[in-house]
């Protein structure tokens, strides 16, 4: 199977999101890369489900709470940007202050 660099990046991000989700389900607090991966993965899946950019920008702020991440992580994550494919093309989804 041949994958483009973009497809490889998406696959790696999705894998990191799955690892983060499993750790969260086990009751572990997520670190910075895990938190960003989980939020990004949720946004990509939402785009695949047909949600709008505006809806995903709001949804991205509900994926994680400060209690679910390690101390200091909410202050480190100011913005998460994910390039997603929508029915009308590729768009950049930005989530500002995603962990409340």
Curated annotation (Swiss-Prot):
InterPro entries: Urease_gamma, Urease_gamma/gamma-beta_su, Urease_gamma_sf, Urease_subunit
Catalyzed reaction equations: urea + 2 H2O + H(+) = hydrogencarbonate + 2 NH4(+)
Localization of this protein: Cytoplasm
Pathway per the UniProt entry: Nitrogen metabolism; urea degradation; CO(2) and NH(3) from urea (urease route): step 1/1
Family annotation (CDD domains): Urease_gamma
Top-level taxonomic group: Bacteria
GO BP terms: urea catabolic process
EC number from the UniProt entry: 3.5.1.5
Keyword Nucleotidyltransferase on entry: no
One GO location term (cellular component): cytoplasm
The entry's keywords: Cytoplasm, Hydrolase
Pfam family, one: Urease_gamma
GO MF annotation: an example: nickel cation binding
Quaternary data: Heterotrimer of UreA (gamma), UreB (beta) and UreC (alpha) subunits. Three heterotrimers associate to form the active enzyme.
Family as reported in the entry's similarity comment: Belongs to the urease gamma subunit family.
Family annotation (HAMAP family): Urease_gamma
Protein name as it appears in the record: Urease subunit gamma
Gene: ureA
């Amino acid at each position: 199977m041949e994958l483009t660099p973009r497809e490889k990046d998406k696959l790696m991000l999705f894998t990191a999101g799955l690892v983060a989700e499993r750790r969260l389900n086990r009751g572990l607090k997520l670190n910075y890369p895990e938190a960003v991966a989980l939020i990004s993965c949720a946004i990509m899946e939402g785009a695949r489900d047909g949600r709008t950019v505006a809806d995903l920008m709001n949804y991205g702020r509900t994926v994680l709470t400060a209690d679910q991440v390690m101390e200091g992580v909410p202050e480190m994550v100011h913005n998460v940007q994910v390039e997603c494919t929508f029915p009308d093309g590729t768009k950049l989804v930005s989530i500002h202050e995603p962990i409340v």
